[in-house]
């Protein structure tokens, strides 16, 4: 399907994506890795706990100087990325309901990719402005009914 990194979609599946959202790419990659394979309801509950800073997201990549968390190793609480993924999961849940799928859904594909870069400015001394570039992020998810192969 055009615009998705997955080539063929499973039978009885739903999909959603968010394009060019202003969140950290590194946090998004780790949150996506954490959510892959979960069922949809438990993923939403976990993201609620991450937003409330009760459950850390284990980091498997980009973990230079990331603090150790009790029981999981290196991890953080990426609140902004968790909010974006929660919105994405709510979108895919609505799409699945529209398609008439059951409530027991599992995440079979979740991907993060770089979007375009935007130029931003930060104030400097003596009235100057320094330019820097910010990467935007694309998110996509595909869910299917549990028990389907």
Curated annotation (Swiss-Prot):
Alphabetical GO biological process terms: cytoplasmic translation
This chain's protein is named Large ribosomal subunit protein uL22
UniProt keyword Transmembrane helix, yes or no: no
Which family, according to the similarity comment?
Answer: Belongs to the universal ribosomal protein uL22 family.
Query: Which gene is the coding source of this polypeptide chain?
Result: rpl22
Query: Which GO terms of the molecular function aspect are on file?
Result: rRNA binding; structural constituent of ribosome
* Cross-referenced InterPro entries: Ribosomal_uL22, Ribosomal_uL22_euk/arc, Ribosomal_uL22_sf
Q: Whose protein is this, by species?
A: Picrophilus torridus (strain ATCC 700027 / DSM 9790 / JCM 10055 / NBRC 100828 / KAW 2/3)
What is the protein's quaternary organization? Part of the 50S ribosomal subunit.
User: Its biological function?
Assistant: This protein binds specifically to 23S rRNA. It makes multiple contacts with different domains of the 23S rRNA in the assembled 50S subunit and ribosome.
Write down a Pfam family by its short name: Ribosomal_L22
Question: Cellular component per GO?
Answer: cytosolic large ribosomal subunit
Keywords for this protein: Ribonucleoprotein, Ribosomal protein, RNA-binding, rRNA-binding
């Amino acid at each position: 399907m055009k615009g998705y990194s997955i080539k063929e979609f499973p039978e009885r599946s739903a999909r959603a994506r968010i394009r060019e959202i202003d969140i950290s790419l590194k946090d998004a990659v780790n949150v996506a890795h954490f959510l892959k394979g979960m069922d949809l309801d438990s993923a939403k509950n976990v993201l609620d706990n991450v937003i409330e800073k009760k459950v850390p997201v284990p980091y498997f990549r980009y973990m230079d100087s990331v603090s150790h968390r009790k029981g999981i190793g290196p991890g953080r609480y990426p609140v902004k990325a968790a909010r974006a993924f929660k919105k994405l999961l709510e979108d895919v849940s609505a799409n699945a309901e529209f398609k008439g799928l059951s409530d027991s859904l599992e995440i079979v594909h979740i991907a993060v990719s770089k979007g375009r870069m935007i130029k931003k400015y930060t104030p400097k001394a003596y009235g100057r402005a320094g330019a820097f570039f910010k990467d935007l992020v694309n998110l996509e998810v595909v869910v299917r009914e549990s028990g389907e192969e």
